[in-house]
Amino acid sequence: FCAFAQSFSMSPETEKALHDLDVAIENKKEYQERLSERIDSIKNVLDKCRKDEYVDNCKQLFNLAFHYSGRASLNALQNILNTPEAKQDTDLRVGAQLHMASVYSVMGLYGVVIRMLRNIEEKDISDVNKQIYYHTIYNNHVRLATYESNILSRADDGTDSVRLALLDSLIAYQTDPVSKAAYKGEKALLQGEPDKAIAIMTPSLGKSTGLIKLRIGYAMAQAEMQSGNVDKWIYYLAKTSEQDIVEARTDYKSMPELVQALYSIGEIDRAYAYLVCMLEDANIFPSRLLEMEVAHHFPLINTKYEVNEAYKRRMDSM
């Protein structure tokens, strides 16, 4: 776990990325309160708005709450499904069901997601919803594989034929070139071609925003890790973690891996601080993978942190 500690030298660029993340964490409560206020403002008008505005308000509520509060996201989607419009509009109904499956997947209800997706008839899935459909299947498959590899203490061999087939479907139905580049990059990663993945994704990273920027940033981190560039691995994990904090997402994807990376180079204080950051938010969404990662890392890093603190106190008293 500390294999890189003796030989690693951090670049100024990566040190700045970590500093920016530290600053973002200091302001985390402000970011979350700001988003929570926006969510509450929409909740407060739901019962008073015109009928023709209700579904749009619920959609806006979902878009704000998704990746911040799973419970609020599910409530918004259920409100949509309860409307007469959802009973008449197949696209609206199926879209809400697919987004609901996405939320359940983050929560860790992988079996529920599989059943929900099987219950949606293929003829009811429009081309627009097919992007969401394959995206949900793919993410659920990856999360389930990650969960199983943690439980069974075995590594994912990266040659998952199902995952590759799902990526092909995502690439085929994706109309946005930036999103398509993200999935092509992930495919190259799965095929063990990190340099190809970096070449595909780098031009799109600067053009991306929101969730797709997070996706590309995390994939870039994986590519750098595969290439053996520890400094760049940490850099991209720090940048995507900062984006999560600033945009008030609490289902952290990069930060658990960043904690592991920092521990591996002997950055115990930062690893501990980021672990505490995740602990504070572990029940907001909630996310099963995040809870598992925190539970996995906390005992080891907490013990090392306490040993370091005890050593510092002894040195200060001399």
PLM region spans:
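A "functional boundary" signal
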Residues: 2-313
